[in-house]
Amino acid sequence: MTAPPPSLHSVAIFVTDLPRAVEFYRDTLRLPVTHEGSFGAELLEGPAHIGVHPAVHADAKKLVGRHTGITLFVTDLLHYCGDLHARGVRFLTEPTQQPWGIMAMIADPEGNILALWEDRTPEGTGEPVSQADGIS
């Protein structure tokens, strides 16, 4: 008998200022916090979560302020990005149409980078979405 394949449990984002990070992910990005403690916080409901953890060891400190490799699915990316702009979120890449949908790249207060993605059929590729589409 073959063992079942593994499933995703969690991904970790390391930070130096845990309260500030939790505030950003909970209040600014509006991700639900499912558990919180001195170990960090767990965000999102479902079979997998994002863990935000204090970088207390030298190896973890090297991981603060880097691309996380995390992509968050957003159903209305242009509206969501407009909200994030109003909340002062730093964008590395504005929403841009790609062959696979619309993508944007943001950074948390410590420089950890996340991608935002909406599965929208492209009308073009690689061009910034215009201000007329709702981004200010």
Model-derived regions: residue spans:
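Vicinal oxygen chelate
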Residues: M1-P4, S7-T16, E42-L44, D59-S136
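N-terminal beta-strand motif that seeds the catalytic metal site of vicinal oxygen chelate
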Residues: M1-V22, H49, T68-I70, R120-S136
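Short strand-connecting beta-turns/loops that link adjacent beta-strands
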Residues: L18, E36-S38, A48, Q98-W100, ...
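Conserved active-site alpha-helix within GNAT-family acetyltransferase domains
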Residues: P19-T28, A104, I113
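Conserved short beta-strand elements that form part of the metal-binding/catalytic scaffold
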Residues: P32-G65, I113-D119
